[in-house]
Amino acid sequence: MNLQDIAKIREVNPVVVNYANFVTPFLVANGLNAVGASPIMSDEVSEAEELVQLASAVVINAGASRKESWPLMNKLCEAANQYQKPLVLDPVAVGATQYRKALNLMLLEKYHFDVIRGNIGEIAVLAGIDWQTRGIDAGNGTGDMSAVVQACAQKFKNVVIASGEVDYISDGQQVITVHNNTKLLPAIVGSGDLLSSIVGAFSAVAENTLDAAVTASLVLSCAGERAAAQLDQQNRPGSFLSYLLDELANITPEQVQDLMKIGEA
């Protein structure tokens, strides 16, 4: 991990193309802008290849996709692989319906995703491991989270992030844990979507994908902790969101270094 990538993003301003979940584009766009990236979103298939060519990374959020949108998703993924741009998948609620499961497995079969970011329930579904999921929530599974994440990374030969109270991140060999957190982050609908897109931004500047995933996790969670501290940990999610964007825009490598709590599972 190289925390100087926090400053590098602000210098490079990588363009991140997002196939966005219609629930959260405001948060994702503003969060990406805050960390120093340049977000762009589109629902037009005819411009997909051109957008990917100018992009530094592509993020696919499968949370609210209609079959009519499959050609656009396919074109974005195809172009990302063709032009060797980092490609991130957020398989929102993949275990909730057969439709969502089929869509995500189709994408993973046809294209190589450098990173998959989901909650532990979503990651377990993709890995083929039983877990009690509940909609977009992780559910109450009792398995070994590090083993689930590692198995998924090995299956798809990429980096996998299971975000939650503790973030588990694996490249199939090692499992890194990030223990920074605040109860206010999950109170913001789309905080996971934002993390997926921030991973895309760091993938554009980091030396390797695992470093990008760990740094992105640390940046969002440490910014969240700093934002919550300004509210004295009160349950004020609306105010927290404003402070979170401020912290994402101003957090420094040194501040993350001082706050970070990482380990290996």
From Swiss-Prot:
Enzyme Commission number(s) from the entry: 2.7.1.50
Membrane-spanning residues: none
Keyword field: ATP-binding, Kinase, Magnesium, Metal-binding, Nucleotide-binding, Thiamine biosynthesis, Transferase
Binding residues for substrate: M41, G190
Catalytic activity: 5-(2-hydroxyethyl)-4-methylthiazole + ATP = 4-methyl-5-(2-phosphooxyethyl)-thiazole + ADP + H(+)
Alphabetized GO MF terms: ATP binding; ATP-dependent NAD(P)H-hydrate dehydratase activity; hydroxyethylthiazole kinase activity; magnesium ion binding
Pfam families listed in its UniProt record: HK
Chain residues that bind ATP: R117, S163
Pathway info: Cofactor biosynthesis; thiamine diphosphate biosynthesis; 4-methyl-5-(2-phosphoethyl)-thiazole from 5-(2-hydroxyethyl)-4-methylthiazole: step 1/1
Cofactor entry: Mg(2+)
SUPFAM superfamilies associated with the record: Ribokinase-like
InterPro entries: Hyethyz_kinase, Ribokinase-like
Gene Ontology BP term (one): thiamine biosynthetic process
HAMAP family per the UniProt record, alphabetical: Thz_kinase
Family designation: Belongs to the Thz kinase family.
Annotated function: Catalyzes the phosphorylation of the hydroxyl group of 4-methyl-5-beta-hydroxyethylthiazole (THZ).
Protein name: Hydroxyethylthiazole kinase
Organism for this UniProt entry: Pediococcus pentosaceus (strain ATCC 25745 / CCUG 21536 / LMG 10740 / 183-1w)
Gene label: thiM
